[in-house]
């Protein structure tokens, strides 16, 4: 058993010798003889031939070596095939992961850029809306002040008309009393008050009346009284018409202000709501941008990790492929040597014997 193992080891070493198919058996053996391991195996062969030992034992060992080499290659092929499938699965997964991260980076970059643009537009618009709110509030205040001034003017003028109409009515009563025969002296105090009130108004409408009343104070006659009563009636009618016109103007202005103030209020509400929406949007935009930037950084790191993993896997696969090819080539060379030795031992035994005899004489 020990002898068989020794021969197996020596022959296996010889199997690694570099030879070419174009060489003759003697040349093959000569090449093997130049190698220290080859010299050893040939010494064993020479001993076998000299002692008449069975060459078949060496043939069996060579057959076992060939079988071992073929078996190792089949195992290596199976492992290589399994590793290739696993590698392709890993590569496909990594490429898919890389594509996913690249897609995410593009999407996040677009989100960051579009949101940044939207943020800028919102910030510009919120400044415009803020200015519009200020203008709206100023317009409301100005128009409200104008309306209040109009109303105050109407109140004042309406009160003046009431006072003037009361003065006209009082004057009509005095004149009617004079017409009825009441002495002027009895009505003088009332007359002077009415006259003073009419003069305070400084209205051109009352100038003819004031002149007529002044004349009536110095001379009372029925003709003058009739003219004054007619004049008083005309003036009162004009005052009534003027007061009605002022009231109509007041009501029209009040109605217009109600519509205008409602419009301004609605516009103010809309602007305030728009500003609140924009301010909330600005906050959300900033949050979105921050999150997009952070996610973009994460996705970039994930992409780099995946690309590094892919590079490592590709290097590993290249190394495995190179190792597999080298080992396959080595086994092929070893198998070729074994096959040539088998050929020498089986088909060219006479040439081997001749060479060994010559070798014995020389060495």
Swiss-Prot record:
Function: Structural protein that crystallize inside the trichocyst matrix.
Broad class of where this protein is predominantly found: other
GO cellular component, one term: trichocyst
Name this polypeptide is given: Trichocyst matrix protein T4-B
Mod. after translation: Two components are produced by post-translational processing from the precursor peptide.
Species of provenance: Paramecium tetraurelia
Keywords: Coiled coil, Signal
Signal sequence segment: 1-17
Coiled coil: 85-119, 244-352
């Amino acid at each position: 058993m020990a002898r068989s193992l020794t021969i197996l080891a020596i022959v296996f070493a010889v199997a690694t010798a570099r030879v070419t198919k174009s060489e003759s058996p003697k040349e093959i053996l000569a090449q093997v003889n130049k190698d220290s391991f080859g010299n050893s195996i040939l010494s064993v062969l020479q001993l076998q031939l000299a002692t008449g030992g069975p060459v078949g034992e060496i043939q069996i060992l060579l057959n076992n070596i060939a079988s071992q080499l073929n078996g190792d290659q089949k195992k290596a092929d199976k492992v290589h095939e399994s590793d290739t499938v696993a590698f392709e699965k890993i590569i496909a997964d990594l490429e898919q992961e890389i594509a996913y991260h690249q897609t995410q980076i593009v999407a996040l970059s677009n989100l960051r850029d579009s949101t940044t643009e939207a943020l800028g537009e919102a910030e510009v618009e919120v400044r415009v809306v803020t200015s519009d709110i200020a203008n709206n509030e100023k317009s409301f205040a100005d128009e409200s002040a104008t309306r209040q001034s109009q109303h105050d003017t109407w109140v004042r003028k309406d009160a003046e008309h009431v006072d003037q109409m009361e003065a006209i009515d009082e004057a009509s009563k005095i004149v009617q009393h004079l017409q009825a025969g009441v002495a002027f002296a009895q009505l003088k105090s009332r007359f002077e008050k009415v006259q003073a009130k009419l003069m305070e108004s400084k209205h051109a409408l009352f100038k003819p009346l004031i002149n007529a009343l002044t004349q009536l104070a110095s001379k009372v006659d029925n003709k003058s009284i009739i003219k004054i009563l007619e004049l008083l009636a005309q003036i009162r009618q004009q005052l009534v018409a003027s007061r009605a016109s002022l009231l109509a103007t007041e009501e029209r202005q009040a109605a217009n202000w109600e519509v205008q103030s409602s419009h301004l209020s609605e516009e103010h509400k809309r602007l305030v709501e728009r500003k609140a929406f924009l301010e909330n949007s600005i906050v959300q935009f900033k949050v979105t941008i921050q999150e997009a930037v952070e996610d973009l950084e994460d996705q970039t790191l994930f992409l780099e990790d995946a690309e590094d993993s892919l590079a490592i896997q590709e290097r590993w696969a290249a190394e495995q492929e190179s190792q597999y090819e080298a080992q396959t080539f080595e086994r092929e060379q070893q198998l070729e040597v074994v096959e040539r030795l088998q050929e020498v031992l089986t088909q060219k035994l006479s040439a081997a014997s001749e060479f060994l005899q010559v070798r014995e004489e020389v060495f």
